[in-house]
Amino acid sequence: MHTYHTPLDLVRSRHVESPVVCARPDRVAQASHWFQDNFPGEVLYAVKANPSAWVLDVLYKAGTRFFDVASIPEIQLVAEHCPAARMAFLHPVKSRESIRRAYYEFGVRIFALDCEAELNKILEETNHARDLTLIVRLAVSNDGALFSLAGKFGVPAYEAADMIRTARAHADELGVSFHVGSQCMQPSAYRSAMLEASRLIAQAGVTVDIVDVGGGFPSIYPGMNPPPMDEYISAIEDAFEEMMVLENADLWCEPGRALVSEAESVLTRVELVKGDALYLNDGAYGRLFDAAHAKWPFPVRLHRRHSTANGKASAETASFRLFGPTCDSLDAIPGPFELPADIAEGDIIEIGMLGAYGTALATNFNGFGSVEYVAVEDMPWPSMFVAQPDQAEDTDATVISLARARRRRPKLRRRA
């Protein structure tokens, strides 16, 4: 990828016809280092959030060695770009072919499940292997999240103890996991879920080797200002100390959004202005799926090739709706988005914080979807991991020192 200091430098230096994804590798590396330095256990990157090759390469270079995968294509990607990495197949429902290939072709030994039928598939397709790590996914409350993931996966509490006992009989190592929901705004949600998991483990009357607190770690978006990330880690650490598990039990987490949300933005061109409607060359079927369908708020800013300093237009702003390039009327993003009132055809809008699920959900519907990737070095929006832009303007970003000693539990000798 070609590197520009800022997206505005790109806009001023060349014609921009198709959407341009602005990658920020430093933001991925910074987030990866933060989790490795602060989370008191194993950190798995949830590949679903952004499976781009450049993201995997940066994470691997930054020290990430454990990946949460959901399909054979994701497994193949990780195997290609991160050759020494461990993988956990944490999709609770997998095809028999996927289980078999993951185990025999790629050496995957960690599998999630939330029912006995899935457990039987795993056992049958691995020929009742004795080296399996089985992770039982529990259903927990998603009340603390802005985007609930409850309802599709997770064994309900009234069945959980039996499921944990059954899995224990077939597992070399046994774990429990849960997901508190996407963009969790309450650190206490992890504590509640962990203590519920502890209760179910005690009810099952067996030992577990792994507690996986899943994902849900938040990012900063317009109107969404979560607590500092270290408050989430503190809540998890404190709850882990209270859990009724062995001293040598491992603690895992699966950040996706938190690792990559700051990593990408898209430059999209205004093709038509019609009242308060802006027609763009990217939209709901491209990298703005969440903006359209989940009504997710993303930051925007205008770039003009010929304008005043910093590419700014008039100080007066107006509220706009956005429409994507396809012929589908559902390709609409109601917003409202505050942009300069004199915005015009040919102007470039940068839509930020698209690193999580922007690329992953993009399609080529109607023949649209082709994009160019470039790297940029700026950090225009608030970050969970580094100093705010107004604190670091025109200087190198300064890392906020939040690292604490990693209080890992003593590692005792594993069961034979």
Show where each model-derived region lies.
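Active-site loop/helix belt of alpha/beta enzymes
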Residues: V140-D276, N366-F368, E377
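A charged N-terminal "starter" segment
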Residues: M1-E124, A129-D131, R165-A171, Q203-T207, ...
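Charged (often Lys/Glu-rich) extended helix/loop segments that serve as interaction or gating elements
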Residues: D250-A416
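Solvent-exposed alpha-helices and their adjacent loops that cap or buttress functional pockets
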Residues: E80-C82, Y104, T126-A129, A145, ...
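Short beta-strand segments
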Residues: A46, D114, T133-A139, S177-H179, ...
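Conserved, mostly hydrophobic/aromatic
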Residues: V28, K48, S71, V78, ...
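Short amphipathic alpha-helical segments
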Residues: D57, E80-H81, E124-E125, N225, ...
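Active-site-proximal loop/turn and secondary-structure-junction residues that shape catalytic pockets
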Residues: R27, A49-P51, P73, V93-S95, ...
